From Swiss-Prot:
Disruption phenotype: Growth defect at high temperature, in the presence of lithium, and during calcium starvation. This is Calcium-channel protein CCH1. Gene3D superfamilies: 1.10.287.70, EF-hand, Voltage-gated potassium channels. Chain C. It is a multi-pass membrane protein. Residues 1-171, 206-288, 2011-2039 are annotated as: Disordered. GO terms for cellular component: plasma membrane; voltage-gated calcium channel complex. PROSITE patterns: EF_HAND_2 (PS50222). InterPro entries: EF_hand_dom, Ion_trans_dom, VDCC_alpha-1_subunit, Volt_channel_dom_sf. GO terms for biological process: calcium ion import across plasma membrane; calcium ion transport. Residues 2021-2033 have a biased composition (Acidic residues). Interacts with MID1 to form a Ca(2+) influx channel. Belongs to the calcium channel alpha-1 subunit (TC 1.A.1.11) family. Residues 271-281 have a biased composition (Basic residues).
Length: 2039
C-alpha cells in the first residue's frame, strides 16, 4: 500500500492536488527536495484539471499573458491573497453590512516550545505549502496567492512563552477542549473543512461555475437534451490512477474530448482547436476604485457575433407545414407574404402605424364631447381609426397565411426538437396515461372512445420517461439551432392580443348596426378592439426587461395564482353563507305623524331597532312590512326602523351571491377600504363579524398575496441575471437605443478626459475650491431654509426681501459654476464626465434667470412652480453627508432599472387609460363629477383614476361609482374584472418589482455570502447554540419535564458540535481579513471613550475615571489557544470574561458590589434576595470568585436547579397576567357606569399590585443593586420597563386619590407596558422583539433619513405652490371675501340655517409644519386622494373652489406620491426585510442553500404510511380496502368525485333569493354527507380503526363529515332565527371544500410548507399580538371616554380594549389612521371636563400623535413588512424553481412513502439496515438512488431488445444492433462515478444509523437528496457541511480499508485453503496415467482429519465491525473492538492454537 492518502478517492477529493497521481507524487518530491534545493523540479504533470477558483488559460497562453501583465501585477498586488480577497471588505460597500452587534469577538494565541512550533506544522499546513510550491512552478499568480494566504498560518504558530500577554487568564471559561485523545478526529474535521476552502480543492467558498460561465446561445435557448449533467458530489473520486488502453479517464488530457470533463464539478474545458474570442469573468467587481480588476480568462469556441448575425440573415428561407391546411410550404403567395412580413422596413412601418393609431385614440378620448365612439364616424379621427383597424386585420390574416395559425409541429420536427401538444401542456395526457395505468387500458378506452394518444406517441412518451442521466439520447446534439422562421401566429402572446383586437373590432362593428350595442349596453368589444396598442410597450427601450421578468415567472405565477383563487373562492362562499342580505338592512326614519314620510340614512347598516315606546329591541323588517327572523348588531334609534330592502350602490355591492362576494373578498385582499366593509357587517350582524375579515387578511393578503410578490421578486431577479449575461455576451446591442447612445458618449468622454492632464494653476485652483466648497452648500441650506420659513401670513415686504436674497444666492452659485468651468477649461472632457458639475452649471443659469424675472414681478405664481429648480440644488446638501450619500448611492445602484420600470409604469398606465376611457366614457354623468371627481370621464381623468387604483387609496370609490351607473349586469361584471386585473398588474406586480430592485441593491452578493456566513456563524450562531444546549427558559423546562422534549438530545452531538465549531474557528483565523476582524479588539464604547478623555482634562472629575475604566462593562472575548507540549497538541476554546480584572477592580472599589451602598455580598438579607431572583445581568460575585447563573441550567436528571427562583418568577408572571386582565376589565367607561368612588375594589386591587411589584423591585435591587453595581437592576432593559411601569402605577394611584383625573389617566396608560413581560415567555418572541425594537432601529433610522431627504424638498416646494390656496367656504360657491353671514344647509331632508365658515381642509400646506405633517401622513397613502381633489379644485388664494379648476396641480402630488411609494414605502419594506435576513443569517444563504432548506421543510412533513396485511384480511375487508382506500374501482372513484364536485357547485350556487333552491340544497347536502360518511366507514373497515386513526387527516375528515351530517339533519327543524347554528352548519359544509387539497399537489405542498413554517410565523404573530394588547390598553385608558368625532363611530372608538384592538388592526393597514388621530386631539371648548370627578371626554394631542404615529411605524411599516419577509423566506419553495431544479415535490415523496410502506407495513418509521438497497431499487425519481435506472435496467432491456417464443422459452431472439446502440449511449464516466457515489451513500447511511441499529424513515429521506438531487458542497451551510465532511471522511476511510481488506481476505483464503489441503490424506497415484485420471471423478476424497489428531476449524476471516463502538458519534469512543466474534462457537481448547495462527 502506498504511504499516501487513499488511492480510491484521492483525485476527486477537495484536499488533494488537482494534477493527478503523477502530480501528487511529484508534489511530495518537491516537498522533500525543498529542504535542500527548492528550485529543482523533476517532472511535470500529465493531466490538468484546473480548480474551480483558479481558472487558468491553456498552457500556450499562460506565459504570454503573464509576460504582458507581470510588471503591472507585481506593482499593484504584491501581497494579495486569494482567500483574503474573498474575505476583504468590499470597496464601496456600506459598513452596516457587517453585523453591528457582535456578541463575541475572537482572540487567538499559541503556546509551546519554539522548536516544536516550527517543526510540528499541522498536516493541513504542510499540504498547503507543498501545493502552493508546486503551483508556484506553473503560475506566478497562484504562487503569490498561496504563499500570502498561508504565511499567516505559519507565523501564527510561532510560540509564545507561557508568560505571554496574549495568553488567556486562568479564570477564562473553557468552552471546548480538544485534547490529544480527540486530535485524530479533530484533524479530520479540520482537514475536511480546510480542503473545502483551499484553492486546490472543490471549494465550499463561491466559485465560477462552468455552467454559469458557458455563454448563452444567441437566441437564449435552454440546454439541449444531449447536454451532460454534472453529478452532484462533494468529492468526485477518481476511478483509477493508471491509464491503460481502453480505460476511462476522468481527468482527460487537454487534447481529449471535453464532454467527459463537463460532468465534473467546477471544471471547464480549457483547450480548443481554434482560437476564438475570449470572455472575461470578473472575480471581484468591487475593485473598480483601484482601476484594477482581477481577470480570469478562458477561451470559448464562439463565433464573432457580427458574423453570426450575417449568417443568420443569409440563411435560406424555409417554411413548414400547410398553413390553414391549404397553403403548402412552396406556395409562391405564402413565400412572398412571409418575406414581406419579415422585412425590417415592414416592422418599422407597423410600429409607426400603431403609434399613429394610439395618438389618434388619445386625441379622440382627451376631451370627448360625443361619447358615442368608434363606429359612428362622428369625428374625423374615426375614419383613420377604421382604416388602420382594417390594415391591422389584414396584417393578422397575412401572418396566419405565412406561418400558420397554431400547429408548428413540422418545424419542430425539422429542427429535431420535442413538440408539446395542448394535451401535454394542459396535463390531460398525463392524467389519461395515469388512468390507463391504474384502471387498465380496456376500461379507460371503453369509457373514452376517441384516441387521446396514438400508439407511436405513447411509445415516445414512455421512452422519454425512461430517459436517464446516464445515457445520451439518440440524435442528441450539443446545441439546438435557433428557428429560422417565426412560430405559428397564435403561439405568440402579442399575436393573440392582436387577434382578440381584430375579432372584437369586427364583432363590435356588426353589433353597432342600428345602435344595437348602445341600446343593450354591450360595451365590452370597444376596449378589446383597441387592445393592440399595448404592443407599444415592447419597443426598443429598457421596458421589455420588465416583461421578461414577468415571463420568467409565469409557471410559478400560475401555481401561486391557483392557490390564491382556491382560497379566494373559499372565502367567497363563506361570505355568502354569513353575510347574505346583510347590506340590505339600513336604518330608515319614519315620521310618527305621517308614516309615508321617510328618510333613509346614508350607509347606516343595522340588525334591528328600538321600539319608540318601550325601547325594547325589535327584529328588522322587510320592505313589505313583514318581520325578520332576528335582532342583532346595530339597533336603529327611536322612530327609525331597520328595513331590509335593496343593496347599496344600485344593488351592486353585497355578499348575496358568489360573484359579488368574491368581488368584496378581493377588496379585503387589497387591504384598502376593507375596514369600511368590516364595520358595515359589524353593524348589520355582530362584532364577531370582524373575525372573517381578520382571517381573510391573514390568509389572502399577508400570506398568499405576499407569495405572489415573492414570485415576482424572484422571477425578476432571474430575468435580470439572464439579461446581464446576454448583455455581457452581446454587448450593448441588447440594450435600448437611448441607453446605447448615452453609454457611447459617456465612454467617449471618459476616454478623452484621460488623455489630457491639468496644468499646475488648474490643479491649485481645484485644491483651493475643494476647501471652500462647503460655503456654497451652506448657501443652498440658507436658501431652502428661507423658503421653508414662508407662511400664508407672510407679508409682501418679507416676500420681496426673500426674492432678492434668492437672486443674490443664485448669482453667487452661478459664479461658482463659472469658476468650476474655468478651472476645468484645460480638460473640458473631464468636466463633462462629472454629471453633478454639468447639472449645477445648467441649473445655475436657469435659477439666475428665474430669480431675476421673479424680482421684476414677471412670473407671478409660475415662480412657485419653477422654484423646483432652486430646490433641486438640495441634492448637494444630501451628498455632503457621507451617510445619506452612501445610502442613496446604494439604493440607486440599480438606477437604470428603476428608471426603466418607472417609465414603463407611466407609459403602460397611459395606454391602459386610453382603453379604459373608451370603455367607461359616458357611464357616470358629467354632473356627478362634483361628488365623484375620478370616474374615467376623459383620458387625463382615466389616467389619474388608474394611478389612484394602483396606489390602492380609496380605489373602491371609483369601482362602486362605475358599478352603480353601469347600464346592466354584464357591464358591472366586466367593470369589476378590469379593475381587479389593473389592481393586480399595477400594485401587486409593477410596484412590487420596485421592492425587488431596491432589495437587490442591498442584498449580499453571491460571492460574499459564504465568507459572511462563516463570520455570522462564529459570532452569533455558535455562542447562541452553546447556550441553548444547556439552558432553557422556565416554560421550556416545564415542557421538557412534563410533556417530553421532542428532540432526542445527545451529549455526543454536543461534543461533536463543539469540535466542529473549534475546527471552523481554527481555520477561519487564517483567512485573510476575516481573521483580522476576529482578532481586532472590540470597539470601545463611545460613552466610556468620552468619559475617559473628559477626566484627563478636568482634575476635579478624577473620580469619574473609575466609571470609564470599569471592566464590568467590557464585552466577553472568545479566545482560541493552541498549545504544543510533551503530551501533544491541544486546542482550547475559552470565554474570557475578564474576571481577574473585575476582581481587582472590586478590591480597589469594594463599594461597587454593595447594593444601596449598604448590603454587602455576605449580608444575609441580600443573600436571601439573591436566592429568589436570578442576576439581572452577568455573573454574581462575592469579591473573591464568580458564581455561574444556573437558573436556566438543566440536564436530564434535574430541570429545576433553583425551585425558589422558578416559583418567584411564576408568581410574578401570574401577577402580571392579573394586572393585564384588570386593566382590560376596569376601563374608564366601566368606572363611569358603575360610579366608582375614590376607594373601591379596583383601587384596593391597584394597591395590591403596587405592593407586589414594589416588593419585586426591592428584592431585585437588594440582590443586585439599582443602577451602578456589577449586576445592576437597570442594566437589564426588561427591568427598566418594569421600573417605568412601577413609577407610573405609583403616580397613577396618588393622582387618583387626589382626584387629578387627567394626570391619572395619562400614567394609567403606562401600566400597559407591563404586558411586554408576556414576551419573555418565549425566547423566539423575545428575539423578535429585540430584532424589531432594538436591532432594527439603525435601519429604521437610515430609512427615515432617506424619507426625510425626499420629504423635506417636496414640503418646501408644496408650501411655495399651495400656501393659502386650499381653503374653502362651507357654502361652496363663495370666496373668502364673501364667506360671512349664514346659509341654508341641508341636514338629512331638512334645510337648516348654518353660519358660513372659511377654513382649511384637514390636510393643507399653509406653513412648513402643516405641509410637513400633511405630506408625512399621505406617505402612508391615507388621505392623499382628498388632498389631490382639493388641489385640483383650487382656483387661487381666497377664491371659490371649482370642480377640476386647476387639474394641472395634480402633477405635484402624483410625482410626490409615486416617489414616496417607490423610495419610502418600498424602501421601508426592503430595509426591514434585509435587516431581518442579516440578523437571522438567512441573507448569507446561497441560492442552493435556500433551495435545500426549503426542500428540507417539505421532506420533514413526510410520515411513513401504515398499510394492513392484505393476506390476513378477510375477503370483505379486502374488498373494502381495494374499494375505499386504494380506490381501484373506477366507477366508485368517479362517483365520489362527482358527488364532491356537485357539493361544491351547490355551495357556489347559494344566493340571497334562491327560491326553492334552499330546499334542494339541504336535501343534496344530506345526500352528499351521507355518501362521504359511508365512504369513511368503508375506509375504516378496510384499513382497520388502528391504522385509520393513526393519520391525523383521517380523524379530521371524519370529524368534519360527522358534524356536517348531524347538523344538516338537525337544520331541517331549526328556525332561521338561530342564525349562529345555521352559520356553523354552513361552515362545516364548506369545510368539505378542503377535501380537494389532498388531490392537488400544489395546494398540499403549500399547506405542508405552512405547517413546517408555523413556529416562526406563530412567534411573530404572538409578538405582534402582545404589542396590540399594550397599545390597546394604553389607548383605552387614555381615550376611553373621548367623545366621538366625524371619523369615529359606535364601533370605531377606544371605549373597550376589544374595540381598541380592532381599531389598531384597521390602522395597521393605514386605514384612516390620521383622521382617527385628528378626532383624538379634541380639546376645550369642543369637549367638557368635570372638575369634581376624574371623567372627561377631551382627548390629548400629545398622546394621540405619540401613540398613533408610533403604532403606524411599528405595526404598518415594521410588523406587516416583517410578515412579508417571513413569508418570502419560508415559502420560497412554493415559488422558486430551486437552485438545482431538484424536482423534489409531493409526487416524488409519495413514491418514497409507497416504497417504504412495502417493507414497513406498520408504519413504525424504522427498518433494518439490510433493507436499504431493496428500498432504493423499488421506485424511481430523484429520491431513489441506484446505479442503473430508466432504459438501462435489466427489465427494460429485456422488454425492448429480447423476444421470447411463448411456446419455446429457449427460443430467444435478441436485437443485438439495437442493444449495442443502447449500450453505446452509456456515459461510462458517470457510471463509474455513480458506483462510487452509491457505495458512499450506502456506507454513510450505515455509519449514521449504526448507533440506532436501524434506518429511520426521515433520516434516510433527508440524506438521499444530498447524493442525488443536490450537491452537498453547494447546498449545506457551514456547520452542516463540516458535519457532512466528517462523516464522508470516515466513510472514505472505511471504503479504503474495505478495499485493502478484500485483497487481504483473498490472500488469507488462499493460504487457508493450502493449509487445509496439507492436513488432508493425499492418495498416491500418477495423475498422468489416463486410467487413474478416469477414476478421479468417482473418488470421494475424505477431507476429515485423521482420528486422534487435534481437530482444527478453518480460520475465520477477520471482518470490520459495524457495531456501536465503531459508529459512535463521539471521537472518544473505544476503538479496540475491531473484530467480529466467529460465527460458530469454537472449542475453548482451541483458543491458544487459533491465537497462534492469527499471529
Amino acid at each position: 500500500m502506498q504511504g499516501r492518502k487513499r488511492t480510491l478517492t484521492e483525485p476527486f477529493e477537495p484536499n488533494t492536488n488537482p494534477f493527478g497521481d503523477n502530480a501528487a507524487v511529484m508534489t511530495e518530491n518537491v516537498e522533500d527536495n525543498s529542504e535542500t534545493d527548492g528550485n529543482r523540479l523533476e517532472s511535470k504533470p500529465q493531466a490538468l484539471v484546473p480548480p474551480a477558483l483558479n481558472i487558468v488559460p491553456p498552457e500556450s497562453s499562460i506565459h504570454s499573458t503573464e509576460e504582458k501583465k507581470g510588471d503591472e501585477y507585481n506593482g499593484n498586488d504584491k501581497d494579495s491573497s486569494l482567500i483574503s480577497n474573498i474575505f476583504r471588505t468590499r470597496v464601496g460597500r456600506s459598513s452596516h453590512e457587517n453585523l453591528s452587534r457582535p456578541k463575541l469577538s475572537l482572540k487567538t494565541a499559541s503556546f509551546g516550545a519554539a522548536e516544536s512550533s516550527r517543526r510540528n506544522v499541522s498536516p493541513s499546513t504542510k499540504s498547503a505549502k507543498s501545493s502552493s510550491q508546486y503551483i508556484d512552478l506553473n503560475d506566478e499568480r497562484l504562487r503569490r496567492r498561496s504563499f500570502s494566504s498561508y504565511s499567516r498560518s505559519s507565523s501564527r504558530r510561532v510560540s509564545n512563552s507561557p508568560s505571554s500577554t496574549d495568553r488567556p487568564p486562568r479564570s477564562a471559561k473553557v468552552l471546548s477542549l480538544i485534547a490529544a485523545d480527540d486530535m485524530d478526529d479533530f484533524e479530520d474535521l479540520q482537514k475536511g473543512f480546510k480542503s473545502a476552502i483551499d484553492e486546490e480543492g472543490l471549494t465550499w467558498l463561491p466559485q465560477l461555475k462552468s455552467e454559469k460561465s458557458r455563454p448563452v446561445s444567441d437566441v437564449g435557448e435552454d440546454r439541449g437534451e444531449g447536454e451532460q449533467e454534472s453529478i452532484p458530489d462533494v468529492h468526485t473520486p477518481n476511478v483509477g490512477a493508471s491509464a491503460t488502453p481502453g480505460s476511462i479517464h476522468l481527468t482527460p488530457e487537454p487534447a481529449q474530448n471535453g464532454s467527459v470533463s463537463e460532468g465534473l464539478e467546477g471544471s471547464i474545458n480549457n483547450s480548443r482547436k481554434k482560437p476564438s474570442p475570449k470572455f472575461f469573468h470578473h472575480l471581484s467587481p468591487q475593485k473598480e476604485d483601484k482601476d484594477q480588476t482581477e481577470v480570469i480568462e478562458y477561451a470559448e469556441d464562439i463565433l464573432d457575433f457580427e458574423t453570426l448575425q450575417r449568417k443568420l440573415e443569409s440563411r435560406p428561407f424555409v417554411l413548414y407545414g400547410h398553413s390553414l391546411g391549404v397553403f403548402s410550404p412552396t406556395n409562391p403567395l405564402r413565400i412572398k407574404i412571409a418575406r414581406f412580413l419579415l422585412h425590417r422596413r415592414y416592422s418599422l412601418l407597423y410600429n409607426t402605424l400603431l403609434t399613429f393609431y394610439a395618438i389618434l385614440l388619445a386625441i379622440r378620448t382627451y376631451n370627448p364631447h360625443n361619447v358615442v365612439f368608434l363606429y359612428r364616424f362622428s369625428n374625423w379621427t374615426d375614419y383613420f381609426i377604421f382604416i388602420l383597424s382594417a390594415c391591422f386585420t389584414g396584417n393578422d390574416i397575412a401572418k396566419i397565411i405565412a406561418f400558420g395559425f397554431w400547429d408548428d409541429s413540422e418545424m419542430f420536427k425539422a429542427y429535431g426538437r420535442e413538440y408539446k401538444s395542448i394535451l401535454q401542456r394542459s396535463g390531460i395526457m398525463k392524467l389519461y396515461i395515469y388512468l390507463r395505468e391504474k384502471y387498465g387500458r380496456k376500461l379507460i378506452d371503453f369509457i373514452i372512445p376517441f384516441r387521446i394518444i396514438s400508439p407511436g406517441e405513447e411509445t415516445k412518451y414512455q421512452r422519454s420517461s425512461l430517459s436517464t442521466s446516464l445515457t445520451k439520447p439518440y440524435g442528441a446534439k450539443e446545441n439546438q439551432r435557433p428557428f429560422g422562421t417565426p412560430r405559428a401566429f397564435a403561439r405568440s402572446s402579442w399575436n393573440r392580443i392582436d387577434l382578440v383586437s381584430s375579432v372584437s373590432f369586427w364583432l363590435g362593428m356588426f353589433l353597432s348596426i342600428k345602435s344595437y350595442d348602445t341600446k343593450t349596453g354591450i360595451r365590452i368589444f370597444k376596449p378589446l378592439a383597441i387592445l393592440r396598442i399595448l404592443r407599444l410597450v415592447n419597443v426598443d427601450t429598457g421596458m421589455p426587461s420588465i416583461l421578461r421578468g414577468l415571463k420568467y415567472g409565469i409557471p410559478q405565477l400560475v401555481n401561486v395564482s391557483s392557490m390564491l383563487v382556491y382560497f379566494w373562492i373559499f372565502f367567497g362562499i363563506l361570505g355568502v353563507q354569513i353575510f347574505q342580505g346583510s347590506f340590505r338592512r339600513q336604518c330608515v326614519w319614519f315620521n310618527p305623524e305621517d308614516p309615508t314620510d321617510t328618510y333613509q340614512y346614508d350607509m347606516q347598516f343595522c340588525g334591528g331597532y328600538l321600539d319608540p315606546v318601550t325601547k325594547r329591541k325589535q327584529n328588522y323588517i322587510y320592505e313589505d312590512g313583514s318581520e325578520g327572523s332576528v335582532s342583532k348588531g346595530f339597533l336603529c334609534p327611536q322612530y327609525s326602523k331597520c328595513v331590509s330592502n335593496a343593496n347599496p350602490y344600485n344593488g351592486r355591492i353585497s355578499f348575496d351571491n358568489i360573484v359579488n362576494s368574491m368581488e368584496l373578498v378581493f377588496v379585503i385582499m387589497s387591504a384598502n377600504t376593507f375596514t369600511d366593509l368590516m364595520y358595515y357587517t359589524m353593524d348589520s350582524d355582530e362584532m364577531a363579524a370582524c373575525l372573517f375579515f381578520i382571517v381573510c387578511i391573514f390568509v389572502l393578503t399577508i400570506w398568499l398575496l405576499n407569495l405572489l410578490i415573492a414570485v415576482l421578486v424572484s422571477s425578476f431577479e432571474i430575468a435580470n441575471e439572464e439579461y446581464k449575461k446576454k448583455k455581457f455576451i452581446y454587448g450593448s446591442r441588447k440594450t435600448g437605443y437611448v441607453a446605447r447612445i448615452v453609454t457611447g458618449y459617456w465612454k467617449y468622454f471618459k476616454l478623452k478626459a484621460n488623455q489630457t492632464k491639468f496644468p499646475n494653476w488648474s490643479q491649485k485652483g481645484l485644491a483651493i475650491y475643494s476647501h471652500v466648497e462647503f460655503i456654497f452648500v451652506i448657501l443652498i441650506i440658507c436658501d431652502i431654509g428661507m423658503r421653508a420659513s414662508v407662511k400664508v401670513s407672510t407679508s409682501a415686504n418679507c416676500n420681496n426681501i426673500l426674492l432678492k436674497t434668492d437672486r443674490g444666492i443664485s448669482i453667487v452659485l452661478f459664479i461658482e459654476s463659472l469658476a468650476r468651468l474655468v478651472l476645468y477649461l484645460p480638460n473640458m472632457w473631464k468636466f463633462l464626465t462629472k454629471p453633478s458639475y454639468v447639472y449645477d452649471f445648467i441649473i445655475s443659469i436657469i435659477t439666475l434667470v428665474i430669480s431675476c424675472l421673479a424680482v421684476e414681478g414677471v412670473l407671478g405664481h409660475m415662480y412657485a412652480w419653477l422654484s423646483i429648480f432652486h430646490i433641486s440644488r438640495f441634492y448637494r446638501v444630501i451628498i455632503s453627508f457621507n451617510l445619506t450619500k452612501k445610502l442613496w448611492k446604494q439604493i440607486l445602484s440599480n438606477g437604470v432599472m428603476i428608471w426603466n420600470l418607472s417609465s414603463f409604469y407611466f407609459f403602460f398606465t397611459f395606454l391602459v387609460a386610453i382603453i379604459m376611457a373608451v370603455y367607461f366614457e359616458g357611464v357616470i354623468p358629467p354632473e356627478e363629477m362634483a361628488d365623484q371627481p375620478f370616474g374615467m370621464y376623459s383620458l387625463p381623468n382615466s389616467f389619474l383614476s388608474l394611478f389612484i387604483i394602483g396606489s390602492t387609496e380609496n380605489w373602491t370609490d371609483i369601482l362602486y361609482a362605475l358599478q352603480k351607473h353601469s347600464p346592466n349586469i354584464s357591464s358591472t361584471f366586466f367593470c369589476s374584472v378590469f379593475f381587479i386585473i389593473w389592481f393586480l398588474l399595477s400594485n401587486s406586480v409593477i410596484l412590487n418589482i420596485f421592492i425587488a430592485l431596491i432589495s437587490e441593491s442591498m442584498e449580499v452578493k453571491e460571492e460574499e455570502k459564504r465568507p459572511q456566513q462563516i463570520k455570522h456563524y462564529l459570532k452569533f450562531v455558535y455562542p447562541q447554540k452553546i447556550q441553548e444546549y444547556t439552558h432553557a427558559s422556565l416554560v421550556a423546562r416545564i415542557r421538557k419535564k412534563f410533556f417530553g422534549g421532542h428532540r432526542n438530545e445527545d451529549t455526543r452531538d454536543f461534543k461533536q458540535f463543539l469540535m466542529r465549531g473549534t475546527a471552523i474557528m481554527n481555520i477561519a483565523q487564517n483567512m485573510g481579513e476575516l481573521a483580522d476582524e476576529f482578532k481586532e479588539p472590540p470597539s470601545e464604547n463611545l460613552f466610556k471613550k468620552g468619559l475617559s478623555k473628559l477626566t484627563i482634562g478636568v482634575p476635579s472629575l478624577k473620580r469619574l475615571r473609575m466609571f470609564a475604566n470599569n471592566p464590568f462593562y467590557k464585552n466577553s472575548d472568545v479566545v482560541f489557544t493552541e498549545t504544543n507540549d510533551i503530551n501533544g497538541r491541544t486546542y482550547i476554546l475559552e470565554l474570557n470574561e475578564y474576571e481577574d480584572e473585575k476582581l481587582d477592580y472590586l478590591k480597589k472599589y469594594p463599594l461597587f458590589n454593595y447594593s444601596y451602598y449598604f448590603f454587602s455580598p455576605q449580608h444575609r438579607f441580600r443573600r436571601f434576595c439573591q436566592r429568589l431572583v436570578p442576576p439581572s445581568t452577568g455573573k454574581r460575585t462575592d469579591g473573591s470568585r464568580f458564581f455561574e447563573d444556573s437558573t436556566d441550567l438543566y440536564n436530564k436528571r434535574s430541570y429545576f436547579h433553583h425551585i425558589e427562583r422558578d416559583v418567584f418568577v411564576f408568581i410574578f408572571a401570574l401577577a402580571t397576567i392579573l394586572l393585564i386582565v384588570c386593566s382590560c376589565y376596569v376601563t374608564p367607561l366601566y368606572r363611569m357606569h358603575h360610579k366608582m368612588g375614590t376607594w373601591n375594589w379596583s383601587s384596593a386591587l391597584d394597591c395590591a399590585f403596587i405592593g407586589a411589584f414594589s416588593i419585586e423591585f426591592i428584592v431585585k435591587t437588594v440582590a443586585d443593586g439599582f443602577i451602578y453595581s456589577p449586576n445592576a437592576y437597570l442594566r437589564n432593559p426588561w427591568n427598566f420597563i418594569d421600573f417605568c411601569v412601577l413609577i407610573s402605577m405609583w403616580i397613577n394611584l396618588i393622582a387618583y386619590l387626589k382626584n387629578n383625573g387627567n394626570l391619572s389617566r395619562i400614567f394609567k396608560g403606562l401600566t400597559a407596558l407591563r404586558a411586554l413581560r408576556c414576551l419573555t415567555i418565549s425566547n423566539t418572541a423575545r428575539q423578535t422583539f429585540n430584532l424589531v425594537m432594538f436591532d432594527g432601529l439603525n435601519k429604521i433610522f437610515e430609512a427615515g433619513l432617506i424619507s426625510l431627504s425626499l420629504l423635506f424638498p417636496f414640503t418646501v416646494w408644496g408650501l411655495s405652490i399651495f400656501k393659502g390656496r386650499l381653503g374653502t367656504c362651507n357654502d361652496g360657491s363663495l370666496g373668502r371675501a364673501d364667506c360671512y353671514n349664514e346659509y341654508s344647509n341641508s341636514v338629512f331632508q331638512w334645510d337648516i340655517m348654518s353660519p358660513r365658515v372659511y377654513q382649511q381642509p384637514y390636510l393643507h400646506l399653509d406653513s412648513f409644519a402643516s405641509a410637513f405633517s400633511s405630506l408625512y401622513q399621505i406617505i402612508s397613502l391615507e388621505g392623499w386622494v382628498d388632498l389631490l381633489e382639493n388641489m385640483m379644485n383650487s382656483s387661487g388664494i381666497g377664491t371659490p373652489a371649482t370642480v377640476m379648476g386647476s387639474a394641472g396641480n395634480a402633477l405635484f402630488l402624483v410625482l410626490f406620491n409615486f416617489l414616496s411609494m417607490v423610495f419610502i414605502l418600498n424602501l421601508f419594506v426592503s430595509f426591514i426585510v434585509n435587516n431581518q435576513a442579516r440578523t437571522t443569517g438567512s441573507a448569507y444563504f446561497t441560492i442552493e442553500e435556500k433551495a435545500w432548506l426549503e426542500s428540507q421543510k417539505l421532506l420533514s412533513q413526510a410520515k411513513p404510511k401504515a398499510i394492513p396485511n392484505l393476506i390476513e384480511l378477510s375477503r370483505v375487508r379486502q374488498f373494502f380496502y381495494q374499494l375505499a382506500v386504494e380506490k381501484k374501482n373506477f366507477y366508485y372513484a368517479s362517483f365520489l368525485q362527482v358527488v364532491l364536485y356537485l357539493h361544491i357547485i351547490m355551495l357556489l350556487s347559494r344566493s340571497y333569493n334562491p327560491g326553492n333552491l334552499i330546499g334542494y340544497q339541504g336535501v343534496y347536502f344530506m345526500f352528499s354527507t351521507s355518501v362521504f360518511l359511508i365512504q369513511e366507514a368503508l375506509h375504516m373497515c378496510g384499513e382497520g380503526p388502528r391504522l385509520y386513526f393513526r393519520q391525523k387527516w383521517n380523524s379530521i375528515r371524519l370529524s368534519i363529515i360527522i358534524i356536517a351530517f348531524i347538523m344538516n339533519a338537525v337544520a331541517f327543524h331549526v328556525p332561521a332565527s338561530h342564525y349562529w347554528f345555521h352559520n356553523i352548519k354552513g361552515f362545516f359544509l364548506l369545510v368539505i371544500f378542503l377535501f380537494i387539497i389532498p388531490q392537488n399537489d400544489t395546494l398540499t405542498e403549500l399547506l405542508e410548507t405552512a405547517m413546517a413554517s408555523l413556529p416562526p410565523i406563530l412567534s411573530l404573530t404572538y409578538t405582534w399580538g402582545v404589542l396590540f394588547l399594550v397599545y390597546a390598553i394604553a389607548l383605552n385608558q387614555i381615550f376611553g371616554l373621548t367623545r366621538l368625532g366625524s371619523n369615529t363611530t359606535d364601533n370605531i372608538n377606544f371605549r373597550t380594549v376589544i374595540k381598541s384592538m380592532i381599531v389598531l388592526f384597521r390602522c395597521s393597514f393605514g386605514e384612516g389612521w390620521n383622521y382617527i388621530m385628528a378626532d383624538l386631539t379634541v380639546s376645550e371648548p369642543y369637549c367638557s371636563s368635570d372638575d369634581n370627578s376624574t371623567y372627561t371626554d377631551c382627548g390629548s394631542e400629545t398622546y394621540a400623535y405619540l401613540l398613533l404615529m408610533s403604532w403606524n411605524i411599528i405595526s404598518m411599516y415594521i410588523f406587516v413588512n416583517m410578515f412579508v419577509s417571513l413569508i418570502i423566506g419560508n415559502f420560497s419553495y412554493v415559488y422558486r424553481s430551486g437552485g438545482s431544479r431538484s424536482g423534489i415535490n409531493r409526487s416524488e415523496i409519495k413514491k418514497y412513502i409507497e416504497a417504504w410502506s412495502k417493507f414497513d407495513t406498520d408504519g413504525t418509521g424504522e427498518l433494518e439496515l439490510s433493507y436499504l438497497p431493496r428500498i432504493m431499487h423499488s421506485f424511481d425519481g430523484p429520491l431513489s438512488f441506484k446505479i442503473w435506472e430508466g432504459r438501462l435496467t435489466i427489465k427494460s432491456l429485456v422488454e425492448n431488445y429480447m423476444e421470447v417464443n411463448p411456446d419455446d422459452p429457449y427460443d430467444v431472439k435478441i436485437d443485438l444492433i439495437g442493444l449495442n446502440k443502447e449500450l453505446n449511449t452509456i456515459d461510462k464516466a458517470k457510471i463509474i462515478q455513480r458506483k462510487l457515489q452509491y457505495r458512499r451513500f450506502v456506507q454513510s447511511i450505515h455509519y449514521t444509523n449504526a448507533y440506532n441499529g436501524c434506518i429511520r424513515f426521515s433520516d434516510l429521506l433527508l440524506q438521499i437528496p444530498l447524493y442525488t438531487a443536490y450537491s452537498a458542497r453547494e447546498c449545506l451551510g457551514i456547520d452542516q457541511y463540516v458535519h457532512h465532511l466528517y462523516i464522508l471522511g470516515k466513510v472514505d476511510k472505511y471504503l479504503e480499508n474495505q478495499r485493502n481488506f478484500d485483497v487481504l481476505e483473498m490472500v488469507v483464503t488462499r493460504w487457508k485453503f493450502h493449509c487445509r489441503m496439507k492436513r488432508t490424506i493425499e492418495p498416491e497415484w500418477d495423475v498422468k496415467d489416463p486410467t487413474v485420471s478416469s477414476h478421479i471423478s468417482n473418488i470421494n476424497v475424505n477431507l476429515e482429519p485423521a482420528p486422534g489428531i487435534l481437530e482444527r476449524e478453518p480460520i475465520a476471516t477477520p471482518r470490520m465491525d459495524y457495531g456501536v463502538n465503531n459508529f459512535m458519534w463521539s471521537p472518544r469512543m473505544n476503538q479496540d473492538s475491531t473484530m467480529e466474534p466467529p460465527e460458530e462457537p469454537i472449542d475453548n481448547n482451541d483458543d491458544s492454537a487459533n491465537d497462534l495462527i492469527d499471529r
